């Protein structure tokens, strides 16, 4: 097994700004609604505070790599180098730290894979810049939201009937582990 890098010590839960959660769900929906349902992939940006808290502030779609219903593949070094270059450009533009990647798992034949696949684990282990990996699960379901399980973020979109579940994984000394995630409320009430 490859050594796991980088190991960044931080305190759970990983905090998500509401805006970033909306971006993640919107990007997952975009892939879900394409012909043949495709996974989406992108980068996460934010901050690591002085008290070792990770705050996700932005999620940015990355169109590189070969996307399919069950994965995103970066086959060659040229593609990988373009992704690294794009991460650096966005880090500079947003003036935030690159924290990791996200991708979606879409419903196929009424089922959605709700874990970190072996390919996901290998990709995460070999990405020496990312210290978290976030998965957005999306499926069409009943007209009521699912309950949140410990440490996950759950969303429901009444207009479309889509359900979302967001899980975060981190590189730890004892391997890749799921860590708790939580939304930071903005305190703003929107009245329609």
Predicted regions: what is each one?
Residues 1-100, 104-192:
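MPN/JAMM (Mov34/JAB) isopeptidase/deubiquitinase module and associated MPN-bearing subunits/adaptors
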